[in-house]
């Protein structure tokens, strides 16, 4: 037994897992505890939950266990709270929750290996595990206490067990599959789409002329376990149904473009399918790994056509169905496509496995370097944190600082090492549709401001995507950036992990952990009338 465990492939897998752990666990306090990811604030702000004292209280929508937040499922919050209360008691809830997220991402690595080995070979399994380990967004989201790492783990485990059902002809795997689908639903309502993989197992068994009574019996067990687990882990999606449906309707409306809050209009005019293929996945999965994955997909499809290997369907059906759905959404957040990563990793692993060792020795270091370039983000202070320190050191107290609404104003709250200073903050309502009143108010606010600080490209990139709504606001930004509005750019804090600007990537890939911060000083002090005249000179 010991001899079987200590072999070259197992040692390589252990090295890959340890390397993945370093990439995911290093500097979980990357933002100095400022909650710079808005979804993290959502979890922390709703973390004041506790066990109800009575059954009546438990069943009530007003229960102390109800997080009163249904944009995401409650499972991650419950996991974070339990871990912080009983395991990692010396840590803050923020760091504990990031640690749990990172651990789920680490646990996914051996699962990718097992899937690759189950369908292909140990070589494919190892290469696939390495590709996933080095995937940029899996490293990034391991540093956030959001649902993504948990969902990717559950997806990978469901994929693995769905394959085992068919390969081993073992129906008992439908028991954990039903439970895991319930977990996925409790993590995020999107997790219900993972049912595609167990359903594929059922279909394969059905057409293989298995005992139909047996198939329907286990199908019933699977559905019952999914429902029971989902209700147990997310009870208030039933007990507080109206609240749940209301928030889900809003979130679905945002996703499909029925509702367009300011933080989504950056996707106005983005081309379905091409946007994630060009402006998301090369950055989030890897500049080299992503094209390798597409080559691997072609190899897998050809292999299925030639050999009719039914197990390959598990690597084709879900990702293509999911992408055909999510790639057409109005809001194309980078995180939506992280559910493709287990499949992309295996596709890329298949492509790499076809190469001679000499080419692997050339490509693998390039894949590692790409990941390490991004990893540097967590080796240096966050740009917003650094900018805030600079503000406390270099801007006099009582100055008026303007910022954009719907983005994080700077400076952040003072740290122990910063000087004690107070500033007056003004938020410019640039997202309001252009009107005479808006431009007049904008001009007044700018005229009295000593500084204007842009803490990410989120707002002005959104504005530039909507010229019909914001012709004058676009001209305002053009004047600002060209130094013609009386404001001079005196400082920029940016960290581009790949040494060149990643502004072409989806905004959400950049704005949380490495946003460019621009600081403008009002040197000429134009009057409101002068500013209005400048902004109004546009067609």
Tell me the role of every PLM-derived stretch:
Residues 16-17, 91-92, 112-134, 167, ...:
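Transmembrane-helix signature of polytopic, membrane-embedded enzymes
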Residues 43-54, 69-74, 78-79, 85, ...:
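Transmembrane-lumen/periplasm boundary regions of multi-pass, lipid-linked membrane glycan transferases
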Residues 95-119, 157, 161, 295-298:
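Transmembrane-helix motifs of polytopic, lipid-linked glycan transferases
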Residues 111-115, 150-167, 176-181, 343-347:
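Specific aromatic-rich, kink-prone transmembrane helix
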Residues 119, 158-174, 184, 206-209, ...:
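Membrane-interface transmembrane helices that cradle and orient dolichyl/undecaprenyl
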Residues 137, 143-150, 333:
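Short acidic/glycine- and proline-prone juxtamembrane loop motifs at membrane-interface regions
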Residues 373-376, 384-539:
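C-terminal luminal/periplasmic domains and tails of membrane-associated envelope-modifying transferases
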């Amino acid at each position: 037994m010991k001899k079987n465990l200590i072999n070259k492939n197992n040692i390589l897998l252990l090295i890959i897992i340890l390397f993945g752990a370093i990439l995911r666990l290093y500097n979980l306090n990357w933002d100095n505890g400022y909650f710079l990811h808005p979804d993290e604030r959502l979890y922390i702000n709703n973390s004041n939950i506790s066990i109800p004292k009575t059954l009546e209280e438990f069943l009530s929508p007003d229960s102390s266990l109800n997080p009163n937040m249904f944009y995401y499922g409650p499972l991650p919050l419950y996991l974070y709270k339990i871990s912080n209360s009983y395991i990692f008691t010396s840590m803050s809830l923020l760091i504990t929750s990031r640690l749990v997220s990172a651990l789920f991402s680490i646990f996914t690595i051996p699962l990718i290996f097992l899937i690759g080995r189950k369908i292909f070979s140990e070589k494919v399994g190892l290469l696939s595990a390495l590709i996933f380990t080095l995937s940029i967004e899996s490293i990034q989201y391991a540093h956030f206490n959001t649902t993504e790492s948990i969902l990717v783990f559950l997806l990978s485990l469901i994929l693995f067990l769905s394959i085992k059902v068919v390969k081993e002809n073992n129906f008992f795997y439908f028991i954990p599959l039903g439970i895991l689908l319930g977990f996925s639903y409790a993590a995020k309502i999107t997790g219900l789409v993972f049912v595609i993989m167990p359903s594929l197992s059922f279909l394969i068994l059905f057409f293989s002329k298995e005992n139909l009574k047996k198939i329907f019996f286990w199908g019933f067990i699977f559905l019952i376990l999914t429902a029971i687990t989902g209700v147990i882990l997310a009870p208030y999606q039933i007990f507080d149904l109206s609240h749940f449906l209301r928030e889900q309707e809003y979130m679905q409306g945002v996703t499909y473009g029925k509702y367009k809050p300011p933080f989504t209009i950056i996707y106005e005019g983005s081309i379905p399918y091409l946007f994630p293929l060009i402006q998301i996945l090369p950055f989030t999965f890897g500049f080299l790994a992503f094209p390798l994955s597409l080559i691997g997909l072609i190899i897998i499809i050809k292999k299925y056509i030639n050999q009719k290997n039914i197990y390959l369907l598990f690597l084709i059906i879900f990702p293509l169905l999911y992408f055909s759905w999510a790639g057409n959404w109005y809001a194309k957040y980078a995180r939506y496509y992280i559910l493709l990563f287990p499949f992309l990793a295996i596709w890329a692993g298949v492509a790499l496995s076809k190469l001679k060792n000499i080419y692997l020795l050339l490509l693998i270091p390039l894949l590692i370097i790409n990941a390490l370039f991004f990893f540097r983000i967590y080796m240096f202070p966050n740009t917003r944190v650094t900018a805030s320190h600079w503000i406390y050191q270099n801007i006099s107290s009582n100055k008026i600082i303007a910022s954009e609404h719907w983005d994080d104003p700077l400076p952040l709250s003072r740290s122990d090492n910063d000087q004690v200073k107070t500033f007056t903050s003004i938020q410019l309502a640039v997202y309001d549709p252009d009107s005479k009143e808006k431009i007049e108010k904008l001009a007044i606010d700018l005229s009295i401001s000593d500084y204007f600080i842009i803490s990410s490209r989120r707002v002005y990139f959104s504005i530039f995507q909507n010229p019909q709504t914001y012709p004058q606001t676009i001209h305002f930004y053009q004047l600002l950036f060209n130094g013609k509005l009386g404001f001079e750019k005196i400082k920029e804090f940016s960290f581009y992990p790949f040494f060149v600007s990643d502004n072409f990537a989806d905004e959400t890939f950049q704005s949380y952990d490495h946003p460019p911060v621009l600081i403008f000083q009002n040197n000429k002090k134009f009057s409101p009338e002068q500013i209005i005249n400048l902004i109004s000179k546009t067609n």
